[in-house]
């Protein structure tokens, strides 16, 4: 059970870090390339 919990925590941290890096790289405030910003 301990190894399963470690694997689950590793996957969760990996996806959370991926989501955070993707959100920061696709931030519309830093890259005003979208047509929504006038």
From Swiss-Prot:
Family from the record: Belongs to the PsbI family.
- List UniProt keywords, sorted A-Z: Cyanelle, Membrane, Photosynthesis, Photosystem II, Plastid, Reaction center, Thylakoid, Transmembrane, Transmembrane helix
**What compartments host this protein?**
Plastid, Cyanelle thylakoid membrane
Looking at the keywords, is Oxidoreductase present?
Answer: no
Name of protein: Photosystem II reaction center protein I
From the UniProt annotation, give the residues forming the signal peptide.
none
Q: Which NCBIfam families match?
A: PRK02655.1 (NF002735)
Task performed by this protein: One of the components of the core complex of photosystem II (PSII), required for its stability and/or assembly. PSII is a light-driven water:plastoquinone oxidoreductase that uses light energy to abstract electrons from H(2)O, generating O(2) and a proton gradient subsequently used for ATP formation. It consists of a core antenna complex that captures photons, and an electron transfer chain that converts photonic excitation into a charge separation.
Q: Which Pfam family, just one, is annotated for this protein?
A: PsbI
The protein's assembly and partners: PSII is composed of 1 copy each of membrane proteins PsbA, PsbB, PsbC, PsbD, PsbE, PsbF, PsbH, PsbI, PsbJ, PsbK, PsbL, PsbM, PsbT, PsbX, PsbY, PsbZ, Psb30/Ycf12, at least 3 peripheral proteins of the oxygen-evolving complex and a large number of cofactors. It forms dimeric complexes.
Q: List the disulfide bonds.
A: none
Which GO CC annotations does the UniProt entry carry?
A: cyanelle thylakoid membrane; photosystem II reaction center
Q: State the organism of origin.
A: Cyanophora paradoxa
Membrane topology summary: Single-pass membrane protein
Membrane-crossing residue ranges in chain numbering: 4-24
Q: Does the keyword Kinase apply?
A: no
Which GO BP terms, alphabetically? photosynthesis
